[in-house]
């Protein structure tokens, strides 16, 4: 089970990097408005998806750690 936890922690690190980059992309877009306004939904959806995956992985990790 510790291998599962280690694998999940590695996945969380990668997901965290993606979520952070998506957050920065959204922030950059907000500073460029109104230029680029047509990409708001696309960038926001990407950011939402990245954070959704990150938080789901964190919940799986909590569940695994409770079972140890």
Kindly give the residue locations of the regions a language model identified:
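N-terminal acidic leader/helix
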Residues: 2-29
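Short, charged, intrinsically disordered terminal tails
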Residues: 4-7, 62-68
């Amino acid at each position: 089970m510790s291998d599962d936890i280690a694998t999940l922690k590695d996945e969380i690190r990668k997901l965290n990097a993606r979520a952070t980059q998506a957050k920065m992309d959204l922030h950059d877009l907000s500073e460029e408005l109104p230029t680029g306004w047509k990409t708001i939904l696309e960038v926001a959806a990407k950011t939402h998806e990245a954070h959704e995956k990150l938080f789901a992985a964190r919940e799986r990790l909590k569940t695994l750690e409770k079972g140890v």
